[in-house]
Amino acid sequence: MPSAPTWPALITTLIEGRHLSVSESTWAMRQVMRGEATPAQLGGLLVALRASGETVDEIVGFRDAVLEEALPLDADPRALDIVGTGGDPYGAVLNISSVASVIAAAAGVPVIKHGNRGASSASGASDVLTALGVDLSITPERVAEVLRETGITYAHAALFHPGFRHAAATRRELGISTLFNVLGPLCNPARPEASAVGVADLSRVPLMVGVFRTRGATALVYRGDDGIDKLTTTGHSHIWEVSRGAVTEHDLDPLELGIPRAPIEALLGEGVEQNAEVIRRVLAGEPGPQRDVVLLNAAAGLEAFDLMGDPTRVQQPMARRLREKVAIAADAVDSGRAAAKLEEWAAATRA
């Protein structure tokens, strides 16, 4: 009978260039989520994993433990999550996924967004949504009710994964992208069946794709060639389309969609309040590079949701599919529905 895992044994395994099994990873993350791991043990684990490179089995084990310890979210899983890993080299990219989620909901897609406060970025989804008037202090039951009432809700990681608080200080002090950046998009407590996920670190794309593939989930996983965890407008992006256990790769040039190039500076935010103000202007219909990149990423979410219902869409060119979805997203903004959706959502969380 194998001996029970210990922290020295697991960290030694990683230092020696070997990897953890699913069960060892589950044990370690369970220790973290229950507050039974010391900061030194957690820091050692995170750095050793970062140095050795995480595997799909390790991420699956960590994810299983996080969801096992999560508070339940009683919601229809036929929904969409648009999310990014964070950890891009700029550390200050506009909260594109948050506003794209509002636009997708305004276009009629049920959205269950999952996120947290900034750890490896200046402004996390929770930070900017709070600035936009969304109350994150509501109960898990109310989170589900808000979805049924408005078509969009937010699963604040600190609420549904209270064990994450045990890792917050270590993550903040390390100041680097860690396995938690990969875990976040995989640990939505509602387990929505469609995901649009941006990954900043190219070496971690196979992890994200591999986990979605083993789950039989539907997802568009993407990365800008400029290193941001979004579909970018500064140049090309790469997309990994996951459907029914198969993966199809695409190269996307936004020029194919009629979207002009933008400098990276146009996609960067300056802080929580400034990002919130940019989002308000985008939802009000202001043209420019911020609008362009938001519509493109909203389109990815809309396409992921449609792919969930119709897997044969993989046979169509990605550029054509996204061009159609950009038009739908633009209409949701220009009609005023997206701005109204944000106000409706925020009001529901405060009711």
UniProtKB/Swiss-Prot annotation:
Residues annotated as binding Mg(2+) 2: 229-230
Which residues are recorded as binding anthranilate 2?
171
* Residues that hold anthranilate 1 according to the record: 84, 116
The organism sits in which domain of life?
Bacteria
Q: What is its EC number?
A: 2.4.2.18
Q: Which InterPro entries match?
A: Anthranilate_Pribosyl_Tfrase (IPR005940), Glycosyl_Trfase_fam3 (IPR000312), Glycosyl_Trfase_fam3_N_dom (IPR017459), Glycosyl_Trfase_fam3_N_dom_sf (IPR036320), Nuc_phospho_transferase (IPR035902)
Question: Which residues participate in 5-phospho-alpha-D-ribose 1-diphosphate binding?
Answer: 84, 87-88, 95-98, 113-121, 125
Q: In which pathway does it act?
A: Amino-acid biosynthesis; L-tryptophan biosynthesis; L-tryptophan from chorismate: step 2/5
Textual note on the cofactor? Binds 2 magnesium ions per monomer.
Listed GO MF terms: anthranilate phosphoribosyltransferase activity; magnesium ion binding
Kindly give the SUPFAM superfamilies that the UniProt entry links to this protein. Answer: Nucleoside phosphorylase/phosphoribosyltransferase catalytic domain, Nucleoside phosphorylase/phosphoribosyltransferase N-terminal domain
Record key words, sorted? Amino-acid biosynthesis, Aromatic amino acid biosynthesis, Glycosyltransferase, Magnesium, Metal-binding, Transferase, Tryptophan biosynthesis
**Which Gene Ontology terms of cellular component type are present?**
cytosol
**Which positions are annotated as binding Mg(2+) 1?**
97, 230
**Biological processes per GO annotation:** L-tryptophan biosynthetic process
Catalytic activity from the UniProt record: N-(5-phospho-beta-D-ribosyl)anthranilate + diphosphate = 5-phospho-alpha-D-ribose 1-diphosphate + anthranilate
Is Transport among this UniProt entry's keywords? no
Record has 4Fe-4S as a keyword: no
Summarize subunit and interaction data from the UniProt record for this chain: Homodimer.
Q: What does this protein do?
A: Catalyzes the transfer of the phosphoribosyl group of 5-phosphorylribose-1-pyrophosphate (PRPP) to anthranilate to yield N-(5'-phosphoribosyl)-anthranilate (PRA).
The UniProt similarity line reads: Belongs to the anthranilate phosphoribosyltransferase family.
Q: Which NCBIfam families match?
A: trpD (TIGR01245)
What's the protein here called? Anthranilate phosphoribosyltransferase
Protein source organism = Clavibacter michiganensis subsp. michiganensis (strain NCPPB 382)
